[in-house]
């Protein structure tokens, strides 16, 4: 077949990719509006699809379970689900758009060593993926998610690895969202590592800029994230006082 490998990969993954894009759009809508009941209905719909016995339906179901658990605080996925997800990602020799999307939307719950192996491999191959225009922003988003995840887990050396990768992305001026989230994440790093109070002000400025751009639902997500970070630190400080 006279077709470049990237186009061939897209042809093979077309159906899976389009179905996942539709699913992720619904997941994002539920997350941004905090629609837990809507996400539960989405999970039921995906579990019904699992009867088709296609591997990707099972992987899609795991993704919804992970995001629903994060949204609701109730338990939906287990170690077997994570093992199945990990086995799938390691088992695919050439990642296409589908695998990139699955990884970047589940990397925060993978075991840290597994996540780092997969993320480093993705970074190592990022020049290949960046040749496909649609994947450039996907790679950037994956790196941003990985950077923030490492900071949250206080894996600061690993976080610096992703910061270095992100600095090589050279976000163009129109990529405002990526620039703002990178700036937010850099200040999150400063706050988590050094307790820098000025970093809190800078993170709030980033959220303010997102609001100014009219992305109010997105701003609420980051407001919730910052509130959670500050709340956890406050609880730890209170526990320290008790002892």
PLM region spans:
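Short C-terminal boundary/hinge segments that cap the last helix of small helical domains
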Residues: 2-19
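Alpha-solenoid helical repeat architecture
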Residues: 13-18, 52-61, 95-101, 133-142, ...
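Hydrophobic/aromatic side-chain positions at a characteristic register within alpha-helices
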Residues: 27-38, 70, 74, 107, ...
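Solenoid-repeat scaffolds in large eukaryotic assemblies
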Residues: 36-42, 78, 115-116, 156-160, ...
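Amphipathic alpha-helical segments of tetratricopeptide repeats
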Residues: 43-48, 84-90, 123-130, 161-172, ...
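Mid-protein regulatory/catalytic core that forms ligand/cofactor-binding pockets
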Residues: 44-152
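Extended alpha-helical scaffolding segments
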Residues: 148-153, 161-201, 205, 210
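C-terminal non-catalytic interaction modules
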Residues: 195-243
């Amino acid at each position: 077949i006279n077709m470049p490998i990237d186009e061939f990969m897209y042809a093979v993954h077309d159906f899976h990719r389009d179905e996942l894009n539709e699913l992720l759009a619904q997941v994002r809508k539920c997350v941004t509006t905090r629609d837990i009941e809507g996400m539960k209905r989405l999970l039921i719909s995906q579990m019904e699809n699992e009867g088709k016995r296609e591997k990707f339906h099972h992987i899609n179901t795991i993704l919804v379970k992970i995001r629903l658990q994060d949204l609701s605080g109730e338990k939906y996925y287990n170690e077997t689900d994570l093992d199945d997800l990990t086995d799938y990602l390691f088992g695919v020799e050439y990642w296409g758009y589908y695998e990139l999307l699955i990884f970047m939307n589940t990397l925060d719950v993978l075991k840290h060593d597994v996540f780092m192996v997969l993320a480093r491999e993705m970074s190592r191959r990022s020049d290949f993926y960046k040749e496909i225009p649609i994947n450039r922003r996907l790679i950037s988003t994956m790196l941003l998610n990985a950077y923030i995840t490492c900071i949250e887990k206080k894996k600061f050396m690993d976080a610096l690895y992703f910061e270095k990768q992100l600095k090589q992305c050279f976000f163009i001026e129109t990529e405002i969202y990526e620039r703002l989230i990178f700036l937010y994440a850099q200040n999150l790093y400063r706050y988590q590592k050094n307790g820098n109070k000025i970093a809190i002000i800078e993170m709030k400025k980033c959220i303010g800029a997102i609001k100014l751009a009219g992305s109010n639902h997105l701003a609420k997500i980051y407001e919730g994230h910052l509130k959670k970070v500050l709340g956890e630190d406050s609880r730890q400080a209170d526990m320290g006082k008790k002892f």
